[in-house]
Amino acid sequence: MIPMTTEKKKLCLSLLGIFFVIFILNSLMARSAGDDYVYSFMWEGHSMYEPLSADARRIAGFSDIAVSAWSYFLTWGGRIVAQAMAMFFLWMPRGVFNVAIALTVVLLVLLMQWTARGGKVTMELPAKSVLITGFFLWAFQANFCGIFIWLDGSCNYLWPMVFLLAWLLPYIRHYMTDGEARYGGWLSPLLFLLGLLAGNGNENTLCWIGLFGLFYLYHIYKKGEMQLWMLAGFAGLSIGYGFLMLAPGNLVRMEESGESFRLFQFSVKAFVAIWFHTMLLSPFYFYLMKAFRKRRELCAISGGRKYVRLSLWFLSASLLFEIIMCLSPEFPFRSLFPSTIFCLTAALLMQHAADRAGASPVRLPGAGVMKRLATLYFAFTFAMTFWIFVENARWFDHWLGEAEAMRGTPAILSITERPPYEEELWTYLTGFHHYAVGLKSDPAHWGNAAMARFYDIGGE
C-alpha cells in the first residue's frame, strides 16, 4: 500500500468536506416542489400545469421511465435526459439521490480544476485551490437551491453542466498540447455517449457550444489533424441537441402556454436577472480584466498564450449564455448556472497561468483578513442554512405524518400554517441558500394535486 502524502490527505479532506456539505443539506430537503411529485408518476401526455388524473400511476421500473420519457418528448419538451434522470431518482429512495448529487458536485469541482490545468486529468491538485472553487460554488450562485438541492432542478442544470465539461476535456487537452495528446479507441464511443448526454442539456448553452465546435473542427480539418474521437463527440452532441430542440413536445408546450421565442423580447424580469448576475460575478470580471492587462507576463510562460485565449473563450461563452436568454419567454435565475460556471472557469484558468508565471494580477492588501472573512461568511451562512433546513424538515414531517394517516381515504389534507422563516430576511441571512416550499394555497393547483395523488389522499 502506497502511503498518502500530506498534500493528498489535504486534497481528500477538502473533497470530503464539499461532499458532506451538499449531502447534509440534501438529506434535510423535503419533497415540496410540485415538479418532484409530477415526475414521480407516468407522464400522462397533457400539460404539466394540469392536475394529474385520479388514476395516475407511479413509476415502478426502468420500462416505465423509458415509456414516460418518450411520452414527455412527444407532448411537452426535449429534455428527455434530464427528466429521465429525475424520474429515476424519484423512483429510488431519497438517499440514492443525496449521495449521487454530492458526488456530482465533487466531480464538478474536479472538472473545473482539470479544465484550469489545460484539460489534464490529475489528482495533483492543491487542496487550497479545491476549497476556493467549492467556496465559489457556494457564494456566487444566483439560485443555489435550484441547482444543488432541488431534485428536478439539479437534473436539468447541474448534471448537464458536468456532462458538458467532461465532454470538453479532450478537446481542451488537444488544443493546449497542439494535438500531441493521444487517446485509445475507447474515447470515441465514450465521447459519443457524453455528447448525447451533454447535447440534450440546456438550450441557451448548447447552441453556442455547437457553433464554436464547428469552427474548431473546421480549423482542425484544415490543419489535417482530424481524429475519429473528435467527430464521434461532435456527432453525439449534435444528435442530443437535435432531440432537445426538435422535440414535438416543444411546439405543444408553446401552444398551450402561449409562450414563444422572439427577437428583442426583453422584460423587466430579464433585466433584473442580468443585473443581479452581473453584480454577483463582478469580482471575477474585475479579476479577469486585470489579468488580461497582464497577458504579456502570462504569455511568457510555456503555453501561456493558450491559457489566455482559452480563458477569453470561456468568458465570451459565459456572456453569450446569458445574453441569449433575452429571447426566452422564461428567465429563471437557475438558467444562469452555465454562465456562472464558465465565468468561474475562466478565472481559474487565468489564476493557474498567473501561478505558473509567478505573477499576481490583483494585489490585495490584507489578503489574510479576506480569507478569514470568507471563512466566517461560509460558517455563518451554512449554519443559518442548516438551521432553516432543519426547521423546514420538521414542519414538513409534521404534515407528512398527517398525509400518511389519511392515505387511501378521500379526506383532503388542509395545511393550516405556512413554513417557518419564509420572510425575505432569512434569504439574506442564509446568503441566498434559502428555498421556498412549493405547496400553494390554491387546492386545485397542479402541484398540490400531484402531492395528493402521491400520498393517495383526497384532492382536486
Model features per residue range: what roles?
Residues 1-6:
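Short, Lys/Arg-rich, polar N-terminal cytosolic tail immediately upstream
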Residues 7-76, 90-110, 117-124, 371-460:
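Intrinsically disordered, polar/acidic, low-complexity terminal segments
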Residues 10-23, 128-135, 233-238, 316:
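Alpha-helical transmembrane segments
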Residues 27-99, 151, 187, 194-319, ...:
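Transmembrane catalytic cores of multi-pass membrane glycosyltransferases
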Residues 105-116, 163-175, 210-218, 283-288, ...:
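Transmembrane alpha-helical segments
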Residues 125-175, 275-279, 319-350:
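Membrane-interface micro-motifs in multi-pass membrane enzymes
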Residues 164-186, 223-224:
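Membrane-interface transmembrane helices that cradle and orient dolichyl/undecaprenyl
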Residues 187-188, 296-311, 355-383:
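Signature aromatic-anchored transmembrane alpha helix within multi-pass, membrane-resident enzymes
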